[in-house]
């Protein structure tokens, strides 16, 4: 297949992306604290990358409780919304499109980041056994062990759904084109999906129908708030991410969730594949089962090359590819790939925290 398909437009819910090379959500931890407020530097960073068919923002808190990393932005205060408005305006001025990725980090958090220094919340009081990021006195990211969470009470769960709903309303106000619900990588929605992190015995635990209940309630709240054509979702239903696996029936459970999402006609399904984290790549047989259940746009992300993306788009198994670190180092990634130009080297030491260095200073062609 010619690579022209990668550079052809794609209807994604309410928008039409100019190409199929999307910018994956990338946590960079450069927001202002206190307040978790996006900065003018972040506006410049995203504006530089507006040639992506769709920019998916870094993961963004739906509430103060949802915070898990020092320096990650929120979208639950007037100051945050006002700052995001400037960011989306800059992307739109360059004819780009932008979704905001909404998350609640759940147990991947630290008590020092939580309101009142409380324990983070989770489906069950089970440690994530992983690390998160705080800031040192110089504002640099430092890695620390996550705190032991407490289990959400049943009566608290509608409040989580409502926090997502309000964040979706705020995203609309802030000028985003779409939202992406973060239901992957071991964060709260994924914690409910996973039988290893969800030991509940009420209607949110046990069967796959119960474990998927929260994420589907959040999706339905988003559809009610803004319409199915504005709601995307990211899932990582195969493999293990941050010590959160998908249980012994991961494929069947994945297909149940994807079928339910497909029935709702949402804007897109973003599949975070396990091979970027050392897992096995998806088989075409599994991809075909996903496609049979979800007829809207499917975005692939993971250990992708241009060749892999072209092949899978050609087979009709995905519709777009989301690159991550390549976008960090190459603000003009689409032009570079189209011209087969050399890519800038990545500077991993500046991925998280800091200022303009390693953020807005990568050269273009």
UniProtKB/Swiss-Prot annotation:
Disruption phenotype: Mutant is still able to grow and use TNT as the sole nitrogen source. Deletion of the gene increases the HOCl sensitivity. Mutant shows no defect in survival of methylglyoxal stress.
Organism: Escherichia coli (strain K12)
Binding site for FMN: 101, 234, 324-325
Record-linked InterPro entries: Aldolase_TIM (IPR013785), OxRdtase_FMN_N (IPR001155), Oye-like (IPR045247)
Presence of keyword Oxidoreductase: yes
One Gene Ontology MF term: FMN binding
Protein name according to UniProt: N-ethylmaleimide reductase
Highest taxon of the lineage: Bacteria
Top-tier EC class: oxidoreductase
EC number: 1.3.1.-
Cofactors demanded by this protein: FMN
Entries under Pfam families matching the protein: Oxidored_FMN (PF00724)
Alphabetical list of SUPFAM superfamilies matching this protein: FMN-linked oxidoreductases (SSF51395)
Keyword flag NADP: yes
């Amino acid at each position: 297949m010619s690579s022209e398909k990668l550079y052809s437009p794609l209807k994604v819910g309410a928008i039409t992306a100019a190409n199929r090379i999307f910018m994956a959500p990338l946590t960079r931890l450069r927001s202002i604290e206190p307040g978790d407020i996006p900065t003018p530097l972040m506006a410049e960073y995203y504006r530089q990358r507006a040639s992506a068919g769709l920019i998916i923002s870094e993961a963004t808190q739906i509430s103060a409780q949802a915070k898990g990393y020092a320096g990650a932005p929120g979208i639950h205060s007037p100051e945050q919304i006002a700052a995001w408005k400037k960011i989306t305006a800059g992307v739109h001025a360059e004819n780009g499109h932008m979704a905001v990725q909404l998350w609640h980090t759940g147990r991947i958090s630290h008590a020092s980041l939580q309101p009142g220094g409380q324990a983070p919340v989770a489906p069950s009081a089970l440690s994530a056994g992983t690390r998160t990021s705080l800031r040192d006195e110089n504002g640099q990211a430092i890695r620390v062990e996550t705190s032991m969470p407490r289990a959400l009470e049943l009566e608290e769960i509608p409040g989580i759904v409502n926090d997502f709903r309000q964040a979706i309303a705020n995203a609309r106000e802030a000028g985003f084109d779409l939202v992406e619900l973060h239901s992957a990588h071991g964060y709260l929605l994924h914690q409910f999906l996973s039988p290893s992190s969800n030991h509940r015995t009420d209607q949110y635990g046990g069967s796959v129908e119960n474990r998927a209940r929260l994420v589907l309630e959040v999706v339905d709240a988003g559809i009610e708030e803004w319409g199915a054509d504005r709601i995307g979702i990211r899932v990582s239903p195969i493999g293990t991410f941050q010590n959160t696996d998908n249980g012994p029936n991961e494929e069947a459970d994945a297909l149940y969730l994807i079928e339910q999402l497909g029935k709702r006609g949402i804007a897109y399904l973003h599949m975070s594949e396990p091979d970027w984290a050392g897992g096995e790549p998806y088989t075409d047989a599994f991809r075909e089962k996903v496609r049979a259940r979800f007829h809207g746009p499917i975005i692939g992300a993971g250990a992708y090359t241009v060749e892999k993306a072209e092949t899978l788009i050609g087979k009709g198994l995905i519709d777009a590819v989301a690159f991550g670190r390549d976008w960090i180092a190459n603000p003009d990634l689409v032009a570079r790939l189209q011209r087969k130009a050399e890519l800038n080297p990545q500077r991993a030491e500046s991925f998280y925290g800091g200022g303009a260095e390693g953020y807005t200073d990568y050269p273009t062609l």
